Amino acid sequence: MGSHMTGENGQLALLDITVEFTGGLEMLFSNQRKHKISLPSLDITGAPSNIAYLIKYLCQNLMKDERKELFVLDDSVRPGILVLINDADWELEGEEQYRIQQNDNILFVSTLHGG
């Protein structure tokens, strides 16, 4: 394992990132739009953390609401949720396979509005 994956004491390195939710998604995350989190740099399989892992991590560790189906469908974000990585559409960045970098800003925007 390279030094960029572990800290000085051999612990798994953490990626400090900002995750934001808008368009109503914030209600699933304690009504808080912006969250600063420290994400493990490797997922449970030992692969570099990517957006797919972040989505699972958010559901398991940050989402307080039981209605996960409003955010995820089949282990991916629901259709109608835009994902921006450092202000760029995630489709330009490789979608779920994008490898998360230190200080990334990931924005989830719901385009679905109930009436």
Curated annotation (Swiss-Prot):
What Pfam families does the record tag this protein with? Urm1
Principal subcellular localisation of the protein? cytoplasm
Where does this protein reside within or beyond the cell?
Cytoplasm
Provide GO CC annotations from the record: cytosol
Q: Which UniProt keywords apply?
A: Cytoplasm, Isopeptide bond, tRNA processing, Ubl conjugation pathway
Query: Pathway, per Swiss-Prot/TrEMBL?
Result: tRNA modification; 5-methoxycarbonylmethyl-2-thiouridine-tRNA biosynthesis
Q: Which residue positions does 1-thioglycine occur at?
A: 115
According to its UniProt record, how is this protein modified after translation?
A: C-terminal thiocarboxylation occurs in 2 steps, it is first acyl-adenylated (-COAMP) via the hesA/moeB/thiF part of UBA4, then thiocarboxylated (-COSH) via the rhodanese domain of UBA4.
* Superkingdom to which the source organism belongs: Eukaryota
Q: Where is this cross-link: Glycyl lysine isopeptide (Gly-Lys) (interchain with K-? in acceptor proteins)?
A: 115
Which example biological process does GO assign this protein? protein urmylation
Q: Family assignment?
A: Belongs to the URM1 family.
What role is this protein assigned?
Answer: Acts as a sulfur carrier required for 2-thiolation of mcm(5)S(2)U at tRNA wobble positions of cytosolic tRNA(Lys), tRNA(Glu) and tRNA(Gln). Serves as sulfur donor in tRNA 2-thiolation reaction by being thiocarboxylated (-COSH) at its C-terminus by the MOCS3 homolog UBA4. The sulfur is then transferred to tRNA to form 2-thiolation of mcm(5)S(2)U. Prior mcm(5) tRNA modification by the elongator complex is required for 2-thiolation. Also acts as a ubiquitin-like protein (UBL) that is covalently conjugated via an isopeptide bond to lysine residues of target proteins such as AHP1.
* Protein name as catalogued: Ubiquitin-related modifier 1
Source organism of this protein record? Coccidioides immitis (strain RS) (Valley fever fungus)
